[in-house]
Amino acid sequence: MDIYKIAIDTFLAETSECKASGCAVFFGADIAFQDIQLHTHRNKSELHFMAGHTMLSIPLASILSIEKLVLRDIQTTEYEIITKESGTITLDVV
């Protein structure tokens, strides 16, 4: 397993349109989706995730880090986004 910290633009280039499963856990709320087409993009102030009929927007200023874990044995890449509000978004991309 290889772990890397990556920039937002690298994350967007790798996940702009992909098949993914994921979950987002924030204080008082959570969402999850499985094996669905994911679209990611950003504007000047927010990072947007669209999975099916679900959209999640995160202020860019609240993102502390994005980690990329390459799981070679199961041919999956996992991305973990950690926010200032102690929120975590985990995406598994095949």
Positions of predicted regions on the chain:
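Structured surface patches comprising rigid loops and adjacent beta-strands/short helices at the edges
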Residues: 36-37, 55-72
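Short, solvent-exposed coil/turn segments at beta-strand boundaries
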Residues: 14-15, 41-44, 74
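Short beta-strand-centered aromatic/proline hotspots
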Residues: 31-39
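A short, Trp-centered hydrophobic/proline-enriched beta-strand micro-motif
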Residues: 13-25
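Amphipathic/hydrophobic helical signal segments and adjacent flexible N-terminal regions
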Residues: 1-8
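Glycine-centered tight beta-turn/hairpin loop motif at sheet-sheet or coil-to-beta transitions
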Residues: 26-28, 51-55, 84-88
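Short, compact, well-ordered microdomains
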Residues: 64-94
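Short aromatic-glycine-enriched beta-strand elements
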Residues: 43-48, 77-79
